[in-house]
Swiss-Prot record:
Protein name: Cyclomaltodextrin glucanotransferase
Listed EC numbers: 2.4.1.19
Protein residues bound to Ca(2+) 1: D61, N63, N66, N67, G85, D87
GO CC annotation: extracellular region
Similarity remark: Belongs to the glycosyl hydrolase 13 family.
Amino acid sequence: MFQMAKRAFLSTTLTLGLLAGSALPFLPASAAYADPDIAVTNKQSFSTDVIYQVFTDRFLDGNPSNNPTGAAYDATCSNLKLYCGGDWQGLINKINDNYFSDLGVTALWISQPVENIFATINYSGVTNTAYHGYWARDFKKTNPYFGTMADFQNLITTAHAKGIKIIIDFAPNHTSPAMETDTSFAENGKLYDNGTLVGGYTNDTNGYFHHNGGSDFSSLENGIYKNLYDLADFNHNNATIDKYFKDAIKLWLDMGVDGIRVDAVKHIALGWQKSWMSSIYVHKPVFTFGEWFLGSAASDADNTDFANKSGMSLLDFRFNSAVRNVFRDNTSNMYALDSMINSTATDYNQVNDQVTFIDNHDMDRFKTSAVNNRRLEQALAFTLTSRGVPAIYYGTEQYLTGNGDPDNRAKMPSFSKSTTAFNVISKLAPLRKSNPAIAYGSTQQRWINNDVYVYERKFGKSVAVVAVNRNLSTPANITGLSTSLPTGSYTDVLGGVLNGNNITSSNGSVNSFTLAAGATAVWQYTAAETTPTIGHVGPVMGKPGNVVTIDGRGFGSTKGTVYFGTTAVTGAAITSWEDTQIKVTIPSVAAGNYAVKVAANGVNSNAYNHFTILTGDQVTVRFVINNASTTLGQNIYLTGNVAELGNWSTGSTAIGPAFNQVIHQYPTWYYDVSVPAGKELEFKFFKKNGSTITWEGGSNHKFTTPASGTATVTVNWQ
């Protein structure tokens, strides 16, 4: 009962403060009144967080004694291909002086912390270094130019004390640049295990790497099984490599990291990544999101499939492209922005878990000399109040510019807290913790034309309404605006920083008003929930016996019931129950997709759909079929007797289409699949052309999977 009263008091206090026009203070997650769903200890959900992506080397040099020497280092940071000296101590210093807390960010996404190559590489007469962190050599040691293991632990401890989570970049796709015929080039892609050499790219007799040439990106298969540029590409079907990465990530999880950003997931087999994610969720589950680069706003079926089946979220490139087109490049309008919001909500099972952003280290920065500051500020406001987990690239708050690599990775120019962009972020970021409509809510368009977008976020009784006019010279008359805001007057959360105004709502309608040219305004209302309402379940995949976290509002203080489908979980299987968070053990039920519900005080919550229960621990198996000839339009698919193989379905849960170009060539087909460990599988292949299915004949193929590691099973078409 105390928990419910505390929530009601906090909600009422924050709402009244906003209606009075006062600024919302930053509420550190370690504060005594913080609820568990918004706390720094919640590693399974980042719905209430704002991420700040920092290139460690480019932020701040806090310890000059660990800087490189010689040709790898430029103290002036004028040569952006060399190390500039930024390190974890620099991040610690800015955590301690409250730069991040004052900005309102509650998670730092740092460069990959592992040991990178020490060699410099000459490309076209230009010396290159591994300052970016993506040329790894040992995934179980730190990059000494960033700091020691003790420094890294200090970074995590310091961040947590300030209510800030730490996300590490992690790149299991490759080591470093290598040439098959020249072992002296760079470090030959060598991989080390805590200082012990595992192997190099040349004379790779153990098959640790792929040797299929460089990718031309012409197909998904080509991108997975060929090298990304000249980077030594791992063969994850190798049992040694599989174990190496499952062990390596546990080392960083045991250090206390709160999240993982996985590099180049488009270039690693889904079957291995799902197995890897399962091992993470068994060990220490944390929020994980991957980089699947999309070059345009167009949807990609493989991208969507990965987001819905891999067990991790993605960086939302569709969001990024739409925002840049509308606010930066002026090549699209608000209808396209609204269309993106609607289409991604349909395509992604957990759209609120996708990580939204306006720029990063792999594209031109949002800000250029030709882009008005107000457009950047509006893009930030839109991102911070939209669905998804917002990520802000370092220096954006200082209007840092730069087109392409390496200019988009320049040194942090200043740490001013007085810029308008800093002010916008600092005012809007805390809403993710104070108003569940921003963290968990649905999105509904309320008023729109080419230049104006008014949208509403809603979760239970809590509401936020956002209005943006991108036209920098013409105000907009807003009439007939409907809203879920209760009757009353509402001040702009931004306090007029972006020329927003106050509004009055009466019986679901907002009085007509003028939205100034270039204005953005945010109005919000929060209220305590008296009925259970689920906002997030994380992770979204697990085996029976794993513990998952349910976040939301109105669960009460007395244990109720959690349902996975129709299976009720009660008693000791619910390890904790608070008004905003429940921790529950996955029951022993048949594997498959389930809707999760909560029942409290005789009332059922909304359904949180698409939770995946696995059969058990996972291993990766490569399924190969010979002599499978097809006609034009046909592809080969796989199905079998477990949920991971589609439970004999020929629909969307079947595996495929299989590949036939790189590892094996037509009429041999193959596919890497995450399947239950130590289990006898029965399976068959089939040909599919639209709705026409042609099964292979004979009895079911059978194969018993290993208890760990990887395997390959090869059969002939029957």
